[in-house]
Amino acid sequence: MEQKRRPFQGVLNILSFNRHFYVFGLGALVILFASRYLIKWPDPIFWIVITAFLYGLIAPLLVSAYVYDFSGYYSLNWLTPLVTDPQKVQTIVNINAGFDETSFIIKSKFPRSDLQAFDFYNAKQHTEPAIKRARKVSLVYPNTRQVASGSLPLTDGTVDLVCLLSAAHEIRSHQEKIAFLKECHRSCAPGGKVIMVEHLRDFSNFLAFSVGFTHFFSRSTWKDAFQRAGFSTFQETKFTPFMSIFECQP
């Protein structure tokens, strides 16, 4: 059963999953203030450094609150113009990296569809501390299957909609991305599509996450991966300045 999201759940998740970053940042601030007793910092330089640290800590939380708590992302209403005939969507696969906040919502929007949830997380290959923590608190959709990113247990040409919602960037290797997307391509039915939502490694996300934007990948990287996987279309729609929705068809 779908659970109602708590107020500020998105930003609280960011704090929880990335707490190592915030512990380090706060520790660095304490050291900087303490250093004033040992080093004669010029005031302008000191406050520029402090402001930069505070910006790096606060900006990601503000943007995350906007995107995940106030933008309507989890309503999935943005799917409506991408799926013009929901009655034809019989089979859906929602693929995540072990943190699944969307399968129950997708099922509520497509109640007559056969929805399968796959988890491609591999502890040896996907080593980010945040995703390890996220997996521990994720609500698991019934019968979620653990899968290998390069070998999805799907029959050729049988899936109407593949959803990759804020998960595919956890595949760090470009070759693994291509192999994974080839599997998505293979499984798509005639008229089927892949819908992927991602932050990008672009200027907007640099302003939001500073060096943390390197956790994401550029539009050109994703375009190359989809094209090399055999997809013929790669259409982008912006959802807030910080997220992109990609609609890709074989």
What name fits each language-model region?
Residues 78, 102-109, 179, 183:
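A short acidic, amphipathic alpha-helical/loop segment
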Residues 2, 8-27, 33-86:
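Class I SAM-dependent methyltransferase Rossmann-like catalytic core
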Residues 149-162:
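A short acidic, Gly/Pro-enriched loop at the edge of an enzyme's catalytic core
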Residues 87, 111, 172, 189:
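Short conserved AdoMet
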Residues 177-193:
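A short glycine-rich, Lys/Arg-flanked "PGG" loop and its adjoining helix->strand segment in the class I
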Residues 91-94, 98-151:
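Class I SAM-dependent methyltransferase SAM/SAH-binding core
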